[in-house]
């Protein structure tokens, strides 16, 4: 089955809990869609919307869809008008419901209501996932890794931590474990048997470039081994061998954004 790719832009003036939940429910009805979700939270100004539209425009040759839960009429109209101008499909979730209630009861909505106060079970689950992921970053606290939903393994600078945090915000408990080529893998792989374990890999030249930039940023250019092309190539090769030996899905992050990598991981998770 050929999957159609959809960039789904979820725009909210609060944390984004509502729009994420609605989008998640809707997407369950489409198995043939490969979705990359971009969550734009706490959008309060037109300038923020301009930046969102600028990012969407960069992918104008792809399928983009905007869903919003902005309650401010003026701001919501600004987003809608610009989406129409750019021919981007747009749907507001809450406005239609609020308008119908307002019309039926002949009352105006409370402009002072703040969606930041909306707290539900999903919110607390997300907080729990974020706390778990923070405490299981970079191989920490592996004694209770069995409580994770997803495990990421990869060499240094393959976006393990930011990907983990993005997934945590979506409600997944994620642990990430570093792979160091010169050191034997220290973890009992039997513990990963029933868990979704993903191997992250990357192009050698790209990783060398990233590591060199990292060394420059911390004023440690003298550490030539960390970014040595031959060493990096060997490290990636060993990591990929481990992934294949254990039949773990491998994702090449070279030309992918955090959102795209996360979308692929979520697809693997949903197949389990």
Curated annotation (Swiss-Prot):
Reaction(s) catalysed (UniProt annotation): N(tele)-phospho-L-histidyl/L-threonyl-[pyruvate, phosphate dikinase] + ADP = N(tele)-phospho-L-histidyl/O-phospho-L-threonyl-[pyruvate, phosphate dikinase] + AMP + H(+); N(tele)-phospho-L-histidyl/O-phospho-L-threonyl-[pyruvate, phosphate dikinase] + phosphate + H(+) = N(tele)-phospho-L-histidyl/L-threonyl-[pyruvate, phosphate dikinase] + diphosphate
Pfam families: Kinase-PPPase (PF03618)
Protein name: Putative pyruvate, phosphate dikinase regulatory protein
Family statement drawn from the similarity comment of this UniProt entry: Belongs to the pyruvate, phosphate/water dikinase regulatory protein family. PDRP subfamily.
Entry keyword annotation includes Ubl conjugation: no
Principal EC category: transferase
Entry superkingdom: Bacteria
Coiled coil: none
InterPro entries: Kinase-pyrophosphorylase, PPDK_reg, Ubiquitin-activating_enz
EC number(s) stated in the UniProt entry for this protein: 2.7.11.32, 2.7.4.27
Transmembrane parts of this sequence: none
Species name: Wolbachia sp. subsp. Brugia malayi (strain TRS)
């Amino acid at each position: 089955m050929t999957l159609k790719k959809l960039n789904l832009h979820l725009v909210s003036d609060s944390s984004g809990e509502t729009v994420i939940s609605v989008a998640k429910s809707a997407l369950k009805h489409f198995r043939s869609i490969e979705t990359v979700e971009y969550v734009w939270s706490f959008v309060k100004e037109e300038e923020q919307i301009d930046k969102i539209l600028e990012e969407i425009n960069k992918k104008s040759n792809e399928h983009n869809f905007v869903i919003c839960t902005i309650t401010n009429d003026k701001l919501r109209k600004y987003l809608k008008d610009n989406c129409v101008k750019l021919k981007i499909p747009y749907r507001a979730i809450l406005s239609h419901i609020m308008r119908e209630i307002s019309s039926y009861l002949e009352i105006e909505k409370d402009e002072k209501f703040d969606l930041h106060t909306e707290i539900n079970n999903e919110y607390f689950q997300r907080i729990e996932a974020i706390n778990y992921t923070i405490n299981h970053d970079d191989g920490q606290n592996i004694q209770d890794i069995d409580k994770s939903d997803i495990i990421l393994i990869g060499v240094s600078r393959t976006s393990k931590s930011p990907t983990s945090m993005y997934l945590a915000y979506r409600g997944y408990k994620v642990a990430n474990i570093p792979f160091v080529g010169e050191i034997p893998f220290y973890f009992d792989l039997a513990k990963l048997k029933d868990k979704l374990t993903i191997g992250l890999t990357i192009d050698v030249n790209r990783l060398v470039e990233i590591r060199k930039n990292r060394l420059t940023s911390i004023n440690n250019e003298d550490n030539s081994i960390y970014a040595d092309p031959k060493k990096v190539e060997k490290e990636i090769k060993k990591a990929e061998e481990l992934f294949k030996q254990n039949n773990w899905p491998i994702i090449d992050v070279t030309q992918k954004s955090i959102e795209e990598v996360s979308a692929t991981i979520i697809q693997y998770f949903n197949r389990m």
